[in-house]
Amino acid sequence: MNKIAKTVLMTGTALCAAGVVLSTAGYFAGGKDFTYTSDHMYVSGGNSSSRKNLTVMKKEQIDDFTKLNVDFEDFDLDIRTSDDDHYYMEYKLEKNGRKNPLTWKDKDGELTLEESAGGSGSYYITYDLGIFSTHADLTEKKDALNTVVLYIPEKAQLSEAELQLSDGDFAADQLLCKEMTLELLSGDLMLDKGEFEKFDAKLSDGDLNVKELQCTDNMQLKSGNGDVTIKKAELADGQIALSDGDIQIDNSSFNGDMKINSSCGDVSVEMKNGSAEKTNIYLKATDGDVDTEGLSRGKTDNEEDTSVYENKAGASAPTLNVECSDGDITLTESEK
């Protein structure tokens, strides 16, 4: 046997031995939880042992409720419009062991949903042994996996909703609620239509996308790292604060005193046609520009690092105050 052949043989033998050692170590380190599905091996992003290790609730009618409390660690929450006048719930959740990952109680008009320690994430890795390739498939949650779905009648209004999601998204077709409190530590908020009296939302790391928002009393929004987009807004008193991200509010009207503060990012506000001249407006951009082209009233003052625009409409008029520390401010009016 020549020298090259011996080298190849010795290398192959060493690699095979290393593979056996690593496989054995992996087995006792948790690899025994791997399951074969369709000639593939599957590993959940948590410690779930199988795709089949799920707890499933098919769409089922639940008691009516006017108060909603949610406390999730990894799950998403999706609120959809019911096809009738009844309330429903469904979910398909991965389990970590035998414990049900969700506990819920619907009593006296109050629905409480809590994620237990038995839940797991929805990201997974698949090893395709058939073609000897490995790939990480960080998928979107398909078929509502690890998502709790609630169905609420179209005209139903909640009196209170308190939602806290640590690592999950919140989405809703429509949500009518008198007092809404929401905290997302790492996740996005997606809302087609929201009508509230009081709206208090905190997003640490995620985007907010709302198609239509109405807040008749007070709105408080704090965003740490993410963009805020509202396509249509009717707002009264409130404050919007962004640490790092852009904000865009289109087709908007302000009926109270609204303050917008951005530490790092651009602010773009489109007001309804003809409403700017009837609003007390103060815009200040530090290390940025203020663009109010197209507005017939108000005055602009530009200094070395600061741009200011101001319009005075009277003491009884609503107020819009926007300050931006590192970014531009754009204020326009919609077309007629």
Where do the model's predicted regions map?
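Acidic/polar low-complexity surface segments
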Residues: 122-141, 294-312
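Loop-centered beta-sheet repeat module
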Residues: 180-184, 199-202
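Hydrophobic membrane-insertion alpha-helices, especially the h-region
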Residues: 9-26
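Short linear S-[DN]-x-LW-Φ motif typified by the pepsin-like aspartic protease active-site region
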Residues: 26-116, 122-123, 141-164, 169-183, ...
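Conserved long hydrophobic alpha-helices within structured protein cores
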Residues: 107-119, 284-295
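Positively charged n-region of N-terminal signal peptides that target proteins for export
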Residues: 1-7
